[in-house]
Amino acid sequence: MTAITTLTLCQVDYANPQHMQALLDLLDGYARDPMGGAEPLSDFAKANLPQALAARPHLFSVLAFDPAAGGLPVGLVNCVEGFSTFACQPLVNVHDVVVVASHRGRGVAEQMLVLVEQLARARGACKLTLEVLEGNTPAQKLYRRLGFENYQLDPAMGQAQFMQKWL
């Protein structure tokens, strides 16, 4: 497939109903995909996510629309600003990267991540972080091409592992 050069990218306005509908639709599609856990978003998440996102200034999202497909929303990246105590600067965690199946492999994620990097730099962030599943080799290739590396402090101590505990 050829790369799409005519995407319309924007930072999501959480108060904009069109942006929020696109965000919810894309996020629900991602949640239903095996890479997102294969379960739809809960009714609670769908009902409360717009207000929850708008209430948190340390969150931001990017949308991609394809004008050639009637302005269809085709990509989403959700980001969370954190803080690096070692650098004493903000960092940005790329939390969700979503591209609809019809547009995968066409440069959508790359274009969105370029905008994410610009927005992170404008926030004074020292780095971007993200998690990726071991089986998602296309995403890993993209992230490496964009300069991401596995996290480690001392190679003798190995690479960091992403862990979770549900509360």
Where are the regions a protein language model picked out?
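A conserved beta-strand-loop-helix scaffold within acyl/acetyltransferase catalytic domains
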Residues: 66, 79-86
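Conserved acetyl-CoA binding element of GNAT-fold acetyltransferases
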Residues: 89-101
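Conserved beta-hairpin
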Residues: 59-77
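Conserved N-terminal entry element of GNAT/NAT acetyltransferase domains
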Residues: 1-21, 25, 32
